[in-house]
Curated annotation (Swiss-Prot):
It comes from the Eukaryota. SUPFAM superfamilies: F-box domain, Galactose oxidase, central domain. CDD domains: F-box_AtFBW1-like. It comes from Arabidopsis thaliana. Residues 1-47 form the F-box domain. The lineage of its organism: Eukaryota, Viridiplantae, Streptophyta, Embryophyta, Tracheophyta. This is F-box protein At3g49510. PANTHER family: BNACNNG10540D PROTEIN, F-BOX DOMAIN-CONTAINING PROTEIN.
Length: 388
């Protein structure tokens, strides 16, 4: 009698290529041969290319996978259709289900930070492997991290250690880097040209991580604060210069500037200001390097002119997470709304021609008020082995 282990490698590859990434771990466990094959090549690309944006999101201190199929929108022949799917992910080797406060993505790997920064580990969702990272000294609650790699594809972790005893305006920063190849931390004698707020998280692109920084200039009796872009280069282990965003707000203290990425090829920046809260502007990079950036306008939307906005939609909500679909010419914004005793995670799909669609992607656990935070979009799996 033929068993699944008797199937040819080509047939097994075709079967596994049709399985969503988030289900591969369960499927691989049914057969040692299937498990071995999937560790040497990436399956599931057909599923991803055919339909979805696969994202990871932090929701109620847990990591969730989120799949959004946007192929059904802007369909002239039939009603728009979006097929959302969100589910909690069980992380291997996290038996106690440590609550997660931060997650950083790079190259198919997720750097997970436990609440109060008590533990740090790296997770490969495709291979189902984890690696726990031991600190050089104790992790602190104000620490912030980034994940990247150098020109030799050697992965590294950047750590900002903020001095908890100083006040926020004068808080000192120390910077460490963890090298996967040597399994050790090193102290870096580097400082960025501008201030990176301790609550700021970066976006990794092509191995480097980009942050928003704040440049402070002192004019005559006036202190000006300008938001800029800053890159940490994991090859040179240095910060680049402050790069322009080309947004000129009347009052930076009341602006929302959010970073996202486009398939590990480009950066996307969303800008919104309290004074003109109904206007959402998005730009994407046409050139992006540690020392240079150029931008083009992707989309500008006046939400006051959009038809069909739901009653719960507020012009003043802060878009903390978003991604764009260049082909469909839309932006997907994430928020939450409360209906009776339940709070729902929402995705708002918006186009510059007035297109709008509201999608309920799931109930928020514990009725948390904050919307889930997007960790990465258009996830591409990795064969990077994590040896704990």
């Amino acid at each position: 009698m033929t068993t699944i282990s008797d199937l040819s490698d080509d047939l097994v590859g075709d079967i596994l290529s049709r399985v969503p990434f988030t289900s591969l771990i369960s499927v691989r466990s049914t057969c040692k041969k299937w498990n071995a094959l999937s560790k040497n090549q990436i399956f599931g690309r057909k599923t991803a290319a055919r339909n979805q944006f696969l994202e990871f999101m932090i929701l109620d201190s847990r990591v969730c996978s989120l799949r959004l199929d946007l192929q059904g929108i802007r369909n002239e022949d039939k009603e728009d259709f979006v097929d959302p799917s969100m589910k909690l992910i069980s992380i291997p080797s996290n038996d106690d289900q440590v609550e997660i406060s931060q997650v950083y993505h790079c190259d198919g790997l997720l750097l997970c930070i436990a609440k109060e920064n008590s533990n740090v580990f790296v997770w490969n969702p495709y291979l189902g492997q984890t690696k726990w990272i031991r600190p050089r000294n104790t992790f602190h609650r104000y620490d912030r991290f980034a994940l990247g790699y150098d020109n030799n594809r050697n992965h590294k972790i950047l750590r900002f250690l903020y001095d908890e005893e100083s006040n926020e305006s004068s808080r000192r920063t120390h910077i460490d880097v963890y090298d996967f190849s040597s399994d050790s931390w090193r102290v870096l004698d580097v400082n960025p040209d501008c201030d990176i707020p301790f609550y700021q998280t970066g976006v990794s692109l092509k191995g480097n991580t980009y942050f928003f920084g704040q440049e402070v200039t002192q004019a005559t009796k006036v202190t000006e604060i300008e938001t800029c872009l800053l890159c940490f280069d994991f090859t040179t282990e240095r910060f680049g210069p402050c790069l322009p965003l080309l947004f000129y707000p009347p009052c930076p203290s009341f602006e929302t500037v959010t970073l996202s990425w486009v398939r590990d090829e480009k950066l996307a920046v969303l800008y919104n200001h309290y004074v003109t809260a109904e206007i959402i502007e998005i730009r994407i990079s046409t050139k992006i390097e540690p020392n240079a950036v150029s931008w083009s306008s992707f989309l500008t939307v006046d939400m006051s002119l959009v038809n069909g906005l739901p009653d719960h939609f507020s012009m003043y909500f802060e878009a903390k997470s978003f991604f764009i679909d260049e082909e469909k010419k839309v932006v997907v914004l994430f928020d939450s709304k409360e209906i009776k005793t339940c709070r729902y995670q929402m995705a708002y799909i918006v186009g510059d021609d007035g297109y709008f669609k509201s999608v309920n992607i799931g109930v928020s656990p514990n009725s948390q008020r904050k919307p889930g935070r997007l960790v990465c979009s258009s996830y591409v799996p990795s064969l990077v082995q994590l040896q704990d």
